[in-house]
Amino acid sequence: SCNCVCGFCCSCSP
């Protein structure tokens, strides 16, 4: 599930 605020689907904080 993409729930990040990096611009797109990323793994900043799962």
From Swiss-Prot:
Q: The cross-link Thiazole-4-carboxylic acid (Phe-Cys): at which residues? A: F8-C9
5-methylthiazole-4-carboxylic acid (Asn-Cys) cross-link, chain position(s): N3-C4
**Disulfide bond positions:** none
- N4-methylasparagine: modified positions: N3
Can you locate the Pyridine-2,5-dicarboxylic acid (Ser-Ser) (with C-10) cross-link?
Answer: S1-S11
Give the superkingdom in one word: Bacteria
Q: Where is the signal peptide?
A: none
Thiazole-4-carboxylic acid (Cys-Cys), cross-linked positions: C9-C10
Example GO biological process term? defense response to bacterium
What are its GO cellular component terms?
A: extracellular region
The cross-link Pyridine-2,5-dicarboxylic acid (Ser-Cys) (with S-11) sits at S1-C10
The annotated crosslink position for Oxazoline-4-carboxylic acid (Cys-Ser) is C12-S13
In its record, the post-translational modification comment is: Maturation of thiazole and oxazole containing antibiotics involves the enzymatic condensation of a Cys, Ser or Thr with the alpha-carbonyl of the preceding amino acid to form a thioether or ether bond, then dehydration to form a double bond with the alpha-amino nitrogen. Thiazoline or oxazoline ring are dehydrogenated to form thiazole or oxazole rings.
- 3-hydroxyphenylalanine sites (modified residues): F8
What is this protein's function per UniProt? Has bacteriocidal activity against Gram-positive bacteria and a few Gram-negative bacteria. It is particularly active against anaerobes. Inhibits bacterial protein biosynthesis by preventing the formation of a stable complex between the elongation factor Tu (EF-Tu), GTP and tRNA, hindering the activation of EF-Tu.
Record's protein name: Thiocillin GE2270
Q: Which organism is it from?
A: Planobispora rosea
